[in-house]
Regions:
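Secretory targeting and sorting signals
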Residues: 1-23
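Low-complexity, acidic Ser/Thr/Pro-rich repeat tracts that form intrinsically disordered stalk/linker regions
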Residues: 20-38
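Extracellular beta-strand-rich solenoid/capping regions of secreted or surface-exposed proteins
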Residues: 80-91, 106-173, 181-199, 208-214, ...
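Right-handed parallel beta-helix
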Residues: 170-180, 194-207, 228, 234-251, ...
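Long, ordered, amphipathic alpha-helical scaffolds
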Residues: 359-450
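Tryptophan-rich substrate-binding surfaces of secreted polymer-degrading and adhesive proteins
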Residues: 448-547
Length: 547
């Protein structure tokens, strides 16, 4: 953990009004870097930043005492820092910094877990191969699995849960150090909690070693897995920000087909269920996953009515199949999202209007693969309404609810309305600017802290090397030796970002066509390559203002 002692925050410049995180008053946490750098562990959700700002706001572990501030680089350390087995009911303010790659499967494997579970009536340990052979519908029939092998699968699944599932309690902030903070193979469950912040971490591949076969799920059966990368259950005031969610080394495209169905080892990337409320999901990147982000666990949970109030904004969804999000019961604000397809792949729909839901969608950008009908963006799951405005598909305005309604019968149509009008939000950016802003800002590694050595005037640097000088972070554009970072011209580019991760314009920053930058409190998008040309300095130039 020695590297953690040299952490330098690169969060500088003017905060965007659309999502201004603020420091916790009265708490230590300003980094020694100066220049307005802020300790991400002490930041709290801005006062108007979505539903998470209601109900008293979301401050996470910002009030943590020094003894409850941890830097972790192993799965065991992370679990202990969160409170271990007692985390679910723990309310101690905590800040947990994730340093580097943490693998919940380090030192174990699916096979090793299975080997601990014998099949009743034999000395043979459980294996999924035996399970598949035993319950093949061609020989076993289309009935639920039962008997010693199913019992052993359930026991193996329970054993896995003790190893790779970790609860997160109340008043907690989990934040990644630098650009390489990653949690692999684990499922973090924020359950029965209040006031939780998760930022700047890549969550990958929360795989289920022992998915269950359900022949009655759908027309052809399905394999169902138990783990989300991050899940929010029966919790309130949660902020998930600037994180990346994916399937890691086991993307959906790599899964085999068993019994004619994908052998699904993942559930959701970020599911919010069981009456959770007042959640903001901002500047995240979701990619290469099927069932991505469901909001609400069951149509039958009528006790969830009036809850599931969630804001999604400035998130990036790349090659996801469905549920982006799918909503039950909630009043959900979805704005300035970027949906992009590099291939049609597993795509089914993006917005799912579920029972008693009310989605208010504005200024979202879609980049669909060739031949994908915009009418497929919306799907109805017993919902009655979905308000949408300002959407573009491949750069052109499209009435998405109108397109959906034109593609279905009258009984399945949606009213283009919401039962409320959002008031808790920052600036809603124009749709044309969304791709540049989101691509520049969303995902882990876009915020500090940044681990980097101090600039040495006697050292030799190559293109891409990162250093710290006078409290700022710089990257070499080409070979450098003896050239001081910060000069108006030279090899060094300053890597300042605002608190949402949007780059701050500096005279040394290289800006390329389509890049978004912040300057004088406004966001600007570059028309072409530039360096040293100040946004707004002339009536015509490389930048146009977003807001």
């Amino acid at each position: 953990l020695a590297a953690a002692t040299a952490v330098v925050m690169a969060v500088t410049g003017t905060a965007l009004t659309s999502s201004a995180a603020t420091g916790a008053a009265g708490e230590e946490g300003t980094s020694p870097g100066g220049r307005g750098a802020v300790d991400l562990g002490r930041q709290v959700l801005g006062a108007d930043d979505g539903w998470g700002a209601a109900n008293g706001g979301t401050t996470g572990g910002s009030a943590a005492s020094a003894e409850h501030v941890s830097v972790v680089d192993t799965w065991d350390e992370l679990r202990a820092a969160l409170g271990g087995a007692g985390a679910r009911t723990d309310t101690t303010p905590r800040i947990v910094y994730v340093d580097g790659r943490i693998d919940a499967f380090a030192g174990t494997s699916c096979e090793a877990i299975a080997a601990t579970v014998p099949v009743a009536g034999s000395d043979v340990p459980f294996s999924m191969d035996d399970y598949v052979a035993a319950y093949d519908p061609a020989t076993y029939g289309w009935v639920d699995p039962a008997g010693p092998l199913e019992d052993a699968r359930a026991a193996a699944a329970a054993e896995q849960a003790t190893r790779t599932l970790q609860h997160v309690g109340s008043n907690v902030t989990i934040v990644g150090l630098g650009a390489d903070a990653q949690v692999v193979g684990a499922s973090l469950r924020i359950r029965d909690a209040r006031n939780v912040i998760v930022r700047n971490v890549t969550f990958s591949d929360a795989r289920d070693c022992f998915p269950a076969w359900d022949p009655g799920d759908g027309d052809a059966g399905n394999w169902n897995s138990a783990y989300d990368n991050v899940s929010v259950w029966t919790s309130e005031n949660v902020w998930v920000d600037h994180s990346t969610f994916d399937d890691g080394e086991h993307p959906h495209s790599s899964l085999p087909t068993v019994f004619g169905r994908p052998f699904e080892i993942h559930d959701g990337l970020l599911d919010i269920t069981h009456g959770s409320d007042h959640v903001t999901v901002s500047y995240n990147h979701f990619s290469d996953h099927d069932k991505t982000a469901i909001l609400g666990s069951s149509d039958s949970r009528t006790q969830d009515a009036g809850k599931h109030k969630v804001t999604y904004h400035h998130n990036r969804w790349t090659d996801v199949g469905q549920r982006a999000p799918r909503v039950r019961f909630g009043d959900v604000h979805v704005y300035n999202e970027l949906y992009e397809q590099t291939r049609e792949g597993i795509f089914q729909y993006y917005w799912g209007a579920g029972v008693d839901s009310s989605i208010y969608a504005e200024n979202n950008a879609f980049e669909l693969a060739a031949g994908v009908d915009p009418a497929r963006i919306v799907a109805r799951w017993k919902g009655e309404r979905l308000f949408e405005t300002g959407s573009t598909v491949n750069g052109e305005p499209v009435d998405l609810v109108g397109a959906y309604n034109a593609s279905v019968g009258e009984a399945d149509r949606l009213a283009d309305e919401a039962r409320w009008t959002p008031t808790l939000h920052g600036t809603v950016d124009p749709t044309w600017a969304v791709p540049a802003i989101v691509r520049s800002s969303a995902g882990a590694g876009r915020l500090g802290p940044v681990d980097a050595p101090a600039y040495d005037p006697h050292a030799t640097y190559g293109a891409g090397d990162v250093v710290v000088h006078d409290g700022a972070v710089f990257r070499a554009q080409w070979y450098a030796r003896g050239a001081t970072p910060g000069a108006a011209w030279g090899p060094w580019e300053e890597l300042a970002t605002n608190e949402q991760g949007v780059p701050v314009w500096t005279p040394t920053r290289v800006v390329r066509a389509g890049d978004a930058v912040v300057h004088d409190g406004a966001v600007w998008v570059a028309r072409w390559w530039s360096r040293g040309q100040e946004p707004g300095a002339a009536s015509w130039g490389p930048f146009r203002a977003v807001g």
